[in-house]
Amino acid sequence: KQASTLILKELKAFQAVLKTQALKHKMTPTIGRSHGIHAEPLTFGLKVANWYEEVGRNIERIKRARQVISYGQISGAVGTFACIHPEVEGYVCAKLGLKPAPVSTQIVQRDRHAEFFTALAILAGTIDKISTEIRHLQRTEVLEVEEFFSSGQKGSSAMPHKRNPVVSEQMSGLARVVRAN
């Protein structure tokens, strides 16, 4: 539950940045692509607005999943309350910010956690999609956008003139790790 609070905080900050960029570039023309091929013109702001909306859906998905996992149980080895009164379970769960699982065995059922991790995997897919698009748009032959590059930053150990999309590459890689687990 605490992890989801941190994730939501960062997602809301990310969404705010996307909103700022979408508004800033609402009139910045770029080429739309379909299957990687030039299609019709659009604005970079529209592209970013789509990311903004998708991140918003991820925020709502994580919120719903957080509610689904916010259950606990101490109803005994097989969930029969043989050694403890249900009121004790209610008290302990309330202290932990959880709700008592209506029915359980020795554990809270894992489908609750599976839903949360599925929401994380979908979020990771969004992050990978955005970072892959930025990497593509930073390619030399496209060069429509670039990641921030601070003064003194080296682009490549062997070719310092390069401006590699390091952050986007890291985001894609970490998103794959999330989806794989």
What does each of the following model-derived ranges do?
Residues 1-6, 33-50:
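Short His/Asp/Glu-rich catalytic/ion-coordination signatures at enzyme active sites or charged loops
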Residues 1-27:
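Hydrophobic alpha-helical hairpins/lids featuring a short glycine-rich hinge
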Residues 12, 19, 40-181:
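Internal glycine-rich alpha/beta core junctions
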